[in-house]
Amino acid sequence: MVARGYASLTFLHEAAEYISTLDVPAYVYHLGDFDPSGVNAGEKINEALREMAPNADIFFERIAVTPEQIAAWDLPTRPTKTSDSRAKGFDRDSVELDAIDPETLRALVREAIKRHLPPHQLVVLKAAEESERTQIRYFVDAASI
């Protein structure tokens, strides 16, 4: 499931219902701006899911943008908007998620997902995927004759 910004109550309720049906832990990864609203949006998602699915094993992790990424990648910052009601106590400059290269974001998501797959299973899935691509190319080429 993907949500942008603050997730709606309906979305969170549906997500919590789904998570409640799982027999395995749920891993929720958050990517958002590093500013008062972006950080708060992630916190609210985490709180709401735990409240709506109290018996579920939920692991929440913000994978972008983090203070460590800002420093390591020298991401461009901007002054935090003082007009944001959540700015009090946020004593850092802000960084937009868009400051991270799209390929880097894909890699962050890929790595987060790979942590949960047995290495052998990933190799098998990649081989099956490549085989399917080859078959599709064959059919496309045959259809164009």
Residue ranges and their predicted role:
Residues 57-145:
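C-terminal or mid-to-C-terminal helical accessory/interaction module adjacent to the motor/catalytic core
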Residues 1, 29-31, 61-63:
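Hydrophobic/aromatic beta-strand patches that form the interior of the parallel beta-sheet core
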